[in-house]
UniProtKB/Swiss-Prot annotation:
Gene3D superfamilies: 1.10.287.1490, YVTN repeat-like/Quinoprotein amine dehydrogenase (2.130.10.10). GO terms for biological process: axonemal dynein complex assembly; single fertilization; sperm flagellum assembly. One of its GO terms (cellular component) is cytoplasm. WD repeats lie at residues 105-148, 151-190, 195-233, 336-375, 387-426, 428-470, 472-507, 510-549, 552-591, 636-675. SMART domains: WD40. Disulfide bonds: none annotated. This is Cilia- and flagella-associated protein 57. It comes from Homo sapiens. The keyword Coiled coil applies. It is linked to Spermatogenic failure 95: An autosomal recessive, male infertility disorder characterized by markedly reduced progressive sperm motility and multiple morphologic abnormalities of the flagella, including irregularly shaped, short, absent, coiled, and bent flagella. It is found in: Cytoplasm, Cytoskeleton, Cilium axoneme. It comes from the Eukaryota. The gene is CFAP57. Belongs to the CFAP57 family.
């Protein structure tokens, strides 16, 4: 590889026709396409980082950034094949994550893309005629679904995902608005368009299921789940005075019908032509962007509207208008705002809105400014600087300043600073500029326009022409290295002029074709030229003759350059080679490898060479040139490179192309270091200013100074007046506040005394309550101690009883063990005899089982044969159905043939219409020729107008002198006016004081009336409060009486409950006592309330039940209807199945019976089951009495244990009920008493049962 390295440093340009051409990476960094790169631009720090396109790419078509701002998808055409490259933006530098370029479906290019909300899926739309929508799992390069969106070759403009749902997709285009859902591996359309189709240009999701769509007729629609919910139309009114007003003219809530549609999407030129003929034109909505409050949309040329959501409805209303400002540097300022907004993007915090336009410009606006300017529309600002909007035709640089000069077919000249990466100066003209050259000093330029060659001064804020030459369509011009000469090409002739006398000193003739490139040698003694005639000439300027020539008619040269020693000429052209020419001979030809070289430049050191290609790449080579393919190739532009230059110090490479972009590159040698050339003098900072401009500015400064002095005096006087007024107001306020403070102090003192009284009262009350509580506690402790002593004595007695019962139970257990051992011996003898009998029976049963298994196999075979016959019948039935379906398909094919014939006839009609259109186009071309001839006449008239303008300027100078005299008289008038104003100001303070005093008197009278009203209101409030106080006193007395009654009731209940506790060991008496308590204390009214509540619940229950029964009845009817529809098909099959199931059930019963017999026999063998008492009595009645005695005793013990357990559970339940009653009534006196254990009583109960 070559040792010469070029690194992208900065780019000036934008490719606005890439779909989705601007994004925010974060709050400071935006991403946009420029050349064949994507640029990450930091708005605050002004740096750029680059994501280059793919190798051999023919340019980017569409971009998409993932919602998590981690991935960037780029659609390109690489070697005439479509490809999608996905970059990871978080890595530094950005690296390729995936490349999607192997497709098993037809595709020409991808025109729109979108990432899913979780960034895992990618949606891509192909161009017509395929118009396929592809749904990718891009990490695995897997196509999840593909569907054809349109079959009529209508363009599709945009695809997108729902912001919350990976499976929901929206597609808009000419005559189509489709919502699709990904399910079961396919994309299915979920909504179908109603009404007449519109040309939908753009859309955005404003909610999970709501979409705003814009059309080419200025209409906005809101769709919710595919149904139209809202519609509005935007109209641009263009009155004759040039002002425009933007009005919403129609708003409806139509849900069914769409409004009528006009013509399909026109081009930008057609739209401008149409608007010039009519006073009313419909704006086209090219871009829509959603944000938290609503959405922003483009509304015709140079305008953006903000819509906000209405609070009470799900509709939107226009809230703000933002315009592209008029450009004062433009030749026609009215045209500067007539550019369509193609893309809109909000920053992540929604503080900034960025827009890109059809003229390759980037604008931004801070959203807070739109809120400030409520009355009038807000205006955009340039995000960076104005950019070229057409191919760059000329490129130049100088020695004394870091300037780059460019000219373009957009009729503008721009000067850039490659050190600060800013735009220094620009100006637009009426004619297109084809070539430009910058003087080495940086103070002059020469520009070749369509009509003339102009020599211009570069002033501090303007570019002014001071000499014109009648050279039409000058394609190349160049200052000499010394700056004393410049050359300009006029067709096939080179004119050489001197910059001192500005005269033509030589005309170099010899080319037979158009000259494409000229270059000076180092000492300006020679000029080298190359042209389309295949000739490269070296001219001697002192003689004006050719010194060397090299002619190759098969090659059309695009660019030539010369080595620093002027011995070798390098030329590139249409024959795909780079030629070294010396002494009229071609020394070497180096292949360009399937591309055409369009530009070439060699460094001043002679060690590096750079060439530009027709595909937009640059190649860096070392010199002398190698024979092999040894160079570094870099992706640069999206079109052929038109111009290339190296700065004088060989530090920077400059490239310009037909895509309207300008790149600056940093150049390095083989060690990676910049190629440094020592500069003896730094860059110049001087600028040119005309004398008249300086005088005007000085005059303006003097006027402003006098105005500043006058304003100072005026402000000082106003300040003094304000100080006096404010000092008086402060004094009044201080007096007022002092009085208020004193009144508040007295109030505070009164409140303190009241607080102290209340504190004393509360303290005494608390002490009384504490004494009362302590006395009650002592009483309760005495009662509890006595109860505890009684319970402890009971507990001792019960413990003695439990010991005696435990000894008796141990004796019974020993007796039971002895009887158990005897019973076991008797049972073993009995079961051994029984076992012998069962073995014989088991052998017999096994033989029976074998016989039954054989019978089962035979029945199984019969069932299988019956099933096979049934399957065969079903097969014949469905084959018959298949034949019927095939016949219906053949019938439908015949119908499709008829439809195809109709389609072919319609196609012929379409072809006839296209022929008519072609004839009309021919007539249009003729008319355009007439228009061009008329335009030439107009240019001649313009020249006459210009000459008359010069005479007018002379007259205007005289008028200017008279205006100066008028200004002097105006100044004298101004002094007199000032004196009059001062006298008026002396009178004004007295009048102001009188007016202020009158206002104060009126305010005091109003305050007095307010005080009277407040007094009357307060008196009424006091009477109301006294009445309320009396009512509350009476109510308090009633409540206290109720409280005393309840306390008495609670005491009576406690005593009765205490009496009940004495019967806690006797359940029957306890039950009677509790019933008595219930009858005594529970009133019937309570029961009635409970019953009423139960009846309400019952009514609610029955109402709900009736509602459910009605629903169930309707559902049953539906089920019955559906069952009747399908019942006839299944009746026969069900009858056959029933017969088969019956046979299978009978076989299962027999099998179950045999299995149970086998299981019983096996259990008998293994002694797993016990013999029932009845069976034992039948087999051996003699041993019945011996076996039943111990078992009966065991059953009695189990029963007594069960009874004890049940009684224990009942006691526990009663205890829980007592605790709940204590918690409800607040009876806590027995809370600390621990009752004795009931184990002894339970033991007594067990003894009694035994």
């Amino acid at each position: 590889m070559s040792a010469v390295v070029a690194q992208t440093l900065h780019v000036f340009g934008l490719r606005s026709h890439v779909a989705n051409n601007i994004f925010y990476f974060d709050e400071q960094i935006i991403i946009f396409p420029s050349g064949n790169h994507c640029v990450k631009y930091n708005v605050d720090q002004k740096w750029q980082k680059f994501i280059p396109g793919s190798e051999k790419s023919q340019g980017m078509l569409a971009l998409s950034i993932s919602p998590n701002r981690r991935y960037l998808a780029i659609s390109e055409t690489v070697q005439e094949k479509p490809a999608i490259t996905i970059y990871e933006l978080s890595s530094i530098p950005c690296r390729k994550r995936k490349v999607l370029n192997n497709f098993d479906f037809q595709v020409q290019k991808f025109i729109s893309m979108a990432f899913s909300p979780d960034s895992k899926y990618l949606l891509a739309q192909t161009s017509p005629p395929e118009s396929n929508l592809v749904y990718w799992l891009w990490e695995k390069q897997k196509v999840m679904a593909i569907v054809r969106i349109d079959t009529q070759n209508n363009p599709v403009y945009q695809v997108s995902f729902s912001p919350q749902d990976n499976t929901q997709v929206c597609v808009t285009g000419n005559g189509m608005f489709k919502l699709l859902r990904f399910a079961e591996g396919t994309l299915k359309q979920t909504s179908f368009q109603r009404g007449e189709p519109q040309n939908y240009l753009a859309h955005t999701w404003v909610a999970d299921d709501k979409i705003v769509v814009g059309t080419d007729t200025g209409k906005l629609f809101l769709f919710e789940s595919g149904d139209q919910r809202w519609e509005t139309s935007i109209m641009v009114k263009e009155p004759t005075n040039g002002s425009k007003s933007l009005d919403v003219i129609q708003e409806s809530e139509s849900l069914i019908e769409f409004p009528p549609v006009s013509s399909p999407l026109p081009s930008y030129e057609q739209m401008v032509a149409a608007s010039s003929h009519s006073q009313m034109s419909m704006p086209q909505v090219f871009a829509i962007a959603a944000y938290s409050k609503g959405f922003a949309c483009s509304a015709g040329p140079g305008r953006v509207l903000l819509f906000e959501k209405m609070e009470e409805k799900d509709f939107y209303r226009e809230s703000r208008e933002i315009r592209i400002p008029v450009d004062p540097q433009s030749n026609d300022p009215s045209q500067s705002d007539k550019q369509d907004v193609l893309c809109l993007c909000f920053s992540p915090s929604e503080e900034t809105l960025v827009a890109s336009t059809s003229k390759n410009q980037l604008y931004s606006i801070t959203m807070s400014l739109t809120e400030i300017s409520k009355g009038e529309p807000a205006h955009f600002e340039y995000l960076m600087y104005p950019l070229h909007s057409a191919p760059i035709t000329g490129l130049a640089t100088c020695i004394r300043k870091p300037l780059i000069a460019t000219c373009s077919l957009d009729r503008s000249i721009r000067l850039w600073n490659y050190e600060t990466n800013t735009l220094e100066l620009f100006k637009e003209y009426q004619e297109e500029a084809y070539s430009i050259s910058l003087h080495p000093s940086g103070h002059f330029i020469v520009v070749g326009f369509a009509d003339k060659l102009r020599l211009m001064n570069l002033l501090i804020d303007d570019i002014r022409s001071f000499k014109e030459y009648s050279v039409r369509g000058c394609g190349e011009c160049s200052f000499s290295n010394g700056g004393h000469l410049f050359a300009a090409v006029n067709g096939n002739v080179i004119h050489v002029y001197t910059t001192t006398s500005l005269e033509n000193i030589s005309s170099l003739k010899g080319h037979t074709g158009k000259i494409r490139s000229i270059v000076w040698n180092a000492d300006d003694s020679k000029l080298i030229s190359g042209g389309t005639d295949g000739a490269v000439y070296e001219w001697n300027l002192s003689t004006g003759k050719r010194e060397t020539e090299c002619v190759l008619k098969s090659c059309s040269y695009n660019c030539v350059t010369v080595s620093p020693d002027a011995k070798i000429i390098f030329a590139v052209g249409s024959d795909h080679t780079l030629k070294e020419i010396a002494d009229s001979l071609i020394l070497r030809e180096i292949s360009a490898f399937d591309v055409t070289y369009t530009a070439i430049v060699i460094s001043h050191s002679g060690r590096m060479m750079f060439v530009g290609t027709s595909v937009g790449t640059i190649r860096a080579m070392k010199y002398p040139l190698p024979l092999q393919k040894e160079f570094n190739e870099y992706q640069a532009h999206a079109g052929p490179i038109t111009k290339m230059l190296l700065t004088f110090d060989d530090q920077f490479l400059l490239t310009a192309a037909e895509d309207g972009c300008l790149f600056t590159w940093k150049v390095f040698d083989k060690d990676g270091r910049g190629i440094k050339r020592e500069r003896e003098v730094g860059f110049a900072e001087e600028v040119l200013v005309t004398k008249t401009d300086m005088e005007e500015k000085a005059q303006v400064m003097l006027e402003l100074k006098t105005r500043v002095e006058e304003l100072k005096m005026e402000n000082e006087y106003q300040l003094r007046l304000k100080d006096m007024n404010y000092s008086e107001k402060i004094k009044e306020l201080t007096d007022k506040f002092i009085q208020e403070m004193e009144s508040l102090k007295t109030k505070n003192q009164v409140l303190r005394t009241e607080k102290e009284k209340q504190d004393v009262y509360h303290h005494e009350h608390i002490e009384d309550l504490l004494d009362k509580q302590s006395r009650e506690l002592q009483d309760m402790e005495c009662c509890n101690n006595q109860k505890l002593l009684l319970e402890y004595e009971k507990y001792q007695e019960l413990q003695l009883k439990s010991q005696r019962m435990q000894e008796e139970y141990e004796k019974q257990l020993r007796d039971n063990d002895e009887t158990k051992s005897q019973a076991l011996e008797e049972l073993t003898e009995f079961y051994e005899a029984k076992l012998q009998e069962k073995t014989t029976l088991l052998e017999e049963a096994q033989e029976d089982v074998r016989q039954q298994l054989r019978e089962f196999e035979e029945t199984k075979k019969q069932i299988e044969e019956d099933e096979d016959r049934e399957i065969q019948d079903i097969k014949t039935k469905y084959e018959k159905k298949l034949r019927d379906e095939k016949e219906s398909n053949l019938r439908l094919k015949g119908e499709t043939g008829i439809m195809r014939k109709k389609f072919s006839s319609l196609q012929k009609e379409i072809e006839e219409r296209t022929n008519d259109i072609e004839t009309l186009k021919g007539e249009q071309m003729k008319l355009q020729g007439v228009i061009k001839s008329l335009e030439k006449d107009i240019q001649g008239l313009k020249r006459e107008i210009q000459e008359r303008d010069e005479t007018i300027q002379d007259k205007e100078k005289r008028i200017y002198d008279l205006k100066k005299k008028n200004q002097e008289l105006g100044k004298f008038k101004f002094v007199l006016d000032y004196k009059i104003k001062e006298l008026k100001k002396q009178i004004e303070p007295r009048e102001n004081e009188i007016r202020v005093m009158k206002e104060q008197i009126q305010e005091m009278e109003a305050e007095l009336e307010n005080f009277h009203k407040q007094n009357t209101q307060l008196e009424l409030n006091i009477t109301e409060l006294w009445q309320k106080l009396r009512a509350t006193d009476q109510e308090m007395r009633r409540e206290r009486q109720k409280e005393r009654d309840l306390e008495a009731l609670v005491k009576r209940f406690k005593t009765d409950l205490h009496n009940c506790v004495a019967y806690i060991q006797e359940p029957r008496l306890l039950k009677e006592k509790v019933r008595g308590l219930f009858e005594k204390y529970v009133q019937r009214a309570d029961m009635v309330e409970i019953a009423g509540l139960n009846t309400d619940l019952q009514q609610e229950y029955t109402r709900q039940r009736e509602h459910l029964e009605r629903n169930l009845a309707t559902l049953k009817k539906k089920v019955v209807k559906e069952g009747e529809l399908h019942r006839t098909d299944y009746v026969r099959i069900m009858q056959e199945n029933v017969s088969l199931i019956k046979e299978i059930n009978e076989l299962r019963r027999e099998l179950k019976f045999t299995r149970s017999q086998v299981y019983d026999l096996e259990a008998a063998l293994k002694l797993t089951k016990k013999v029932r008492p009845q069976e034992v009595s039948e087999t051996e009645p003699s041993r019945d009495m011996l076996s039943t005695a111990p078992t009966a005793r065991l059953n009695e013990q189990e029963e007594t244990g069960r009874i004890i357990e049940m009684q224990r559970l009942e006691i526990q339940r009663l205890r829980d009920q007592i605790q709940e009653q204590e918690q409800v009534t607040g009876f806590h006196t027995l809370a600390g008493v621990r009752l004795p254990s009931l184990s002894n009583s339970e033991v007594d109960l067990e003894v009694k049962t035994n």
